[in-house]
Amino acid sequence: MKAKELIMVDVQNEEHCRSIVKLINYYMLDEMGQGESMREGMGAKIIHGLRNHSCYIGFFGCIENDYAALANCNINFSTWQAKPLINIHDLIVAPAYRNQGFGLFLLTEIEKYARENDYCRINLEVRHDNYKAQKLYQKAGFSACNPENYFWEKLLL
């Protein structure tokens, strides 16, 4: 079996940027995304935004020369622990690489990175009906918050 490799995203690297857009589009096309392709021009806006977002950190799961998976994350700060934390905003595995351990690989490697850099926790959100993702997250040691939290939003667009 070929070895999986973790690569930190470099938003100044054009190959990385193309791979980010490609992988996000896979997510958008998925039933757990929006079920349709990325809007025209959205890829460039995403890359521009990531390049200008000082708290962005990303991780690719690669095999040979292929970008198989992506975790788009943000660094945040826990005032309760007085330490930084990682929020996983997107976790995407390309359709051709699903059910091959890339999701668990990324989560495990992000945890190693967080421990090595003295982060206090990793958090993420998951749709209530995304049972495959929930199973993966539980396998990686994640659990619902106790007490259970709600994720709320106020759309400004």
Predicted feature locations:
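Conserved N-terminal entry element of GNAT/NAT acetyltransferase domains
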Residues: 1-18, 22, 157
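Conserved beta-strand in the GNAT
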Residues: 58-60, 66-75, 87, 92
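Conserved acetyl-CoA-binding loop-helix of GNAT-fold acetyltransferases
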Residues: 93, 99-112, 135, 139
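Short loop/turn motifs at secondary-structure junctions and domain boundaries
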Residues: 49-54
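Conserved GNAT acetyl-CoA-binding A-motif
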Residues: 107, 114-125
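Conserved GNAT-fold acetyl-CoA-binding loop/helix
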Residues: 25-48
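Conserved active-site alpha-helix within GNAT-family acetyltransferase domains
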Residues: 104, 128-147, 151-154
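A short, polar/charged loop-to-alpha-helix boundary motif
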Residues: 78-84
